[in-house]
């Protein structure tokens, strides 16, 4: 029944039959947290992107809130990547290393 020409002919159920939704799975990293500075598409304003943290969304949001408070700036969590406004790479690196994470500064 996975043929593209097949269709449901008769059903006693009413309404649409919904497909079960699957949660998006992030690819596993190599265990190293990378901090990258990005300005493209942001009108010259720089942000630090923190990738490679293997946590669920609730823990990432909690960690991002803590980093934003310590850095004194704004930020967001988008698709498993933490964005911190401004160039605070050195401060973020020291904070994450204090939590026992392996951190690398990626990019220039």
Swiss-Prot record:
One of its GO terms (biological process) is translation reinitiation. Residues 1-15 have a biased composition (Polar residues). InterPro entries: DENR/SUI1_TIF, SUI1, SUI1_arc_bac, SUI1_dom_sf. Pfam families: SUI1 (PF01253). CDD domains: YciH_like. Residues 16-29 have a biased composition (Basic and acidic residues). Residues 1-29 are annotated as: Disordered. GO terms for molecular function: mRNA binding; translation initiation factor activity. The keyword Acetylation does not apply. Keywords: Protein biosynthesis, Translation regulation. PROSITE patterns: SUI1 (PS50296). Belongs to the SUI1 family. This is Uncharacterized protein YciH. It comes from Salmonella typhi. The lineage of its organism: Bacteria, Pseudomonadati, Pseudomonadota, Gammaproteobacteria, Enterobacterales. The gene is yciH.
